[in-house]
């Protein structure tokens, strides 16, 4: 959502671009202003929030919004990947900026180096794909997000009272993580039993 605003040069996008480049977090109120209307549009369907909430205040605002809108939260997944693996993925990441398509030199390389497979246009490195920004983000994660995750770990799931709201899934590669994630999703969302990928 933030990257869409950055690509389209909106006011929020310009703010997000500065924040992303600095490796810091968007203000809580700004994030909820973006997320709230999107969730309201999806009230009758399934939805995934990736990377939100990241702070206690965001989690509290999200909780208040979901309660007011009668939208129960079904599942929170905490992906646990070693920091050195995340850094390596970031350093090897190349992006087709207009579409957001992402390539990785180790496990999803483009057919031709530096060229998008679909359009033939050049791939780019994001300005924030560097060790310094990664370090700031990891420090923020440990300082701000990890305590919130620990609180969510204790919360029951509103729709499945016998199940935890938060589930930890760990691994180093998507071929290890994906089957675990799919299993959790299919257990929690029975209507998605046939989903393969």
PLM features per residue range, with description:
Residues 1-71, 82-88, 126, 133:
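ATP-dependent small-molecule kinase phosphotransfer cores
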Residues 8-13, 113-121:
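Short, flexible, mixed-charge acidic loops at enzyme active sites
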Residues 16, 99, 146:
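Basic DNA-binding region of bZIP-type proteins
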Residues 25, 52-53, 80-81, 110, ...:
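Short, surface-exposed acidic/glycine-rich loop or hinge patches that mediate macromolecular interfaces
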Residues 47, 73-75, 164-167:
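Residue-level recognition of the N-termini of beta-strands and the immediately preceding loop/turn
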Residues 50-51, 69-93, 98-118:
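Conserved phosphate-donor/acceptor-positioning beta-strand/loop module used by diverse small-molecule
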Residues 66-69, 94, 156, 185:
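Active-site catalytic pocket residues across diverse enzymes, especially alpha/beta-hydrolases
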Residues 122-197:
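NTP-dependent small-molecule kinase module
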